[in-house]
């Protein structure tokens, strides 16, 4: 028995001595990440997604299915969903980190251009070098009550098939019949109709700040000093001569429109808190014997995995998750024992070693019903595309 007041110091030495005796080797044994079997990982990911979707839609529980109309979705709603899905598919798989305001779901709205029979188009009918598209800002304001709520606005035009290559330009209508240049594009020959998309977020935000009225865009042939042919050879659905019967309906439905994504006013009041977002998105710290931190595939079927019938499109999606070890190096040049002790003191539930976490995430467009009204919304950060050690 040691005398009273004395301690056996050797008991405190093994960890530092191990670090000194094994310089340059991974300290995998020091990780506080727990080994979790794959099925448990998947179950936790599914439950996290259940909470994410309800939270992003500001729903305390899944909507009732009792009043949902039977049959397929209305054509206009399906067209809006398809437009949103196509836009997401066309974006980069490695987006910039989204600001906190992008946590909540965005309501997606389609605002059609003013009908071609409106008198505002009278002065533009005989112009061959341009086509004109006008929008009523009161329609836009219905979807976006306040300019800061607007997340993104796109002008979408359906170009009909063409055998001609042409350089085109887009302009924004200013006061006193002046036009502001926005951008250009080279259109190559195509055998099928194709959608053209232009980012006009800043323009629409400007319109919302100016008040109600009629605003518009001009889509023109590039004017070259070397060419005498300034005629626009591009046909746009909804602007070229109207078809009859069913073709006329499709023609009208596909006329140019603004695709608006905005945070609903009631959700904007909850943007001050970011803790809830982090708790849902990065609550788990994984480590296993698998090689490398990387994306693991996980498909979620809304009916089978979540027991939900209220999401009409899509039926499911590849949510994916991150898994794999993240070793780091301990050596004589990197004495982290004091820092590690301090870190553990202030973060008792956190991992002492790097963990495999999502790096790039993509949004998920959905169609669901509120009562008997179908809604199209875009849920941010729902699909894991790449992972990193952090």
Swiss-Prot record:
Q: Cite the InterPro entries for this sequence.
A: Cystine-knot_cytokine (IPR029034), TGF-b_C (IPR001839), TGF-b_propeptide (IPR001111), TGF-beta (IPR016319), TGF-beta-rel (IPR015615), TGFb1 (IPR003939), TGFb_CS (IPR017948)
Q: What's a GO cellular component annotated to this UniProt protein?
A: neuronal cell body
Recorded hits in Pfam families, A to Z, give: TGF_beta, TGFb_propeptide
| Entry-linked Gene3D superfamilies | 2.60.120.970, Cystine-knot cytokines
Where does this chain carry the motif Cell attachment site?
244-246
Could you name the domain of life of the organism this protein comes from? Answer: Eukaryota
Q: Which UniProt keywords apply?
A: Cleavage on pair of basic residues, Disulfide bond, Extracellular matrix, Glycoprotein, Growth factor, Mitogen, Secreted, Signal
Free-text description of this protein's post-translational modifications in UniProt = Transforming growth factor beta-1 proprotein: The precursor proprotein is cleaved in the Golgi apparatus by FURIN to form Transforming growth factor beta-1 (TGF-beta-1) and Latency-associated peptide (LAP) chains, which remain non-covalently linked, rendering TGF-beta-1 inactive.
Q: Transmembrane helix as a keyword?
A: no
Q: List the disulfide bonds.
A: 285-294, 293-356, 322-387, 326-389
Region Straightjacket domain, residue ranges:
30-74
Q: Which GO terms describe its molecular function?
A: cytokine activity; deubiquitinase activator activity; enzyme binding; growth factor activity; identical protein binding; protein serine/threonine kinase activator activity; protein-containing complex binding; transforming growth factor beta receptor binding
Q: Does the keyword Glycoprotein apply?
A: yes
Signal peptide start and end residues: 1-29
Region span, Arm domain: 75-271
Residues with an annotated glycan are 82, 136, 176
For region Bowtie tail, the annotated ranges are 226-252
**Gene Ontology biological process terms in this record:** adaptive immune response based on somatic recombination of immune receptors built from immunoglobulin superfamily domains; animal organ morphogenesis; aortic valve morphogenesis; ATP biosynthetic process; branch elongation involved in mammary gland duct branching; bronchiole development; canonical Wnt signaling pathway; CD4-positive, CD25-positive, alpha-beta regulatory T cell lineage commitment
- Tissue specificity statement from the Swiss-Prot or TrEMBL entry: Expressed in cardiomyocytes. Weakly expressed in the mammary glands, with a slight increase of expression following onset of involution.
UniProt family annotation = Belongs to the TGF-beta family.
The record's note on quaternary structure and interaction partners says: Homodimer; disulfide-linked. Interacts with the serine proteases, HTRA1 and HTRA3: the interaction with either inhibits TGFB1-mediated signaling and the HTRA protease activity is required for this inhibition. May interact with THSD4; this interaction may lead to sequestration by FBN1 microfibril assembly and attenuation of TGFB signaling. Interacts with CD109, DPT and ASPN. Interacts with EFEMP2. Interacts with TSKU; the interaction contributes to regulation of the hair cycle. Interacts with TGFBR3.
Q: What does this protein do?
A: Transforming growth factor beta-1 proprotein: Precursor of the Latency-associated peptide (LAP) and Transforming growth factor beta-1 (TGF-beta-1) chains, which constitute the regulatory and active subunit of TGF-beta-1, respectively.
Q: What is this protein called?
A: Transforming growth factor beta-1 proprotein
Organism listed in the record: Mus musculus (Mouse)
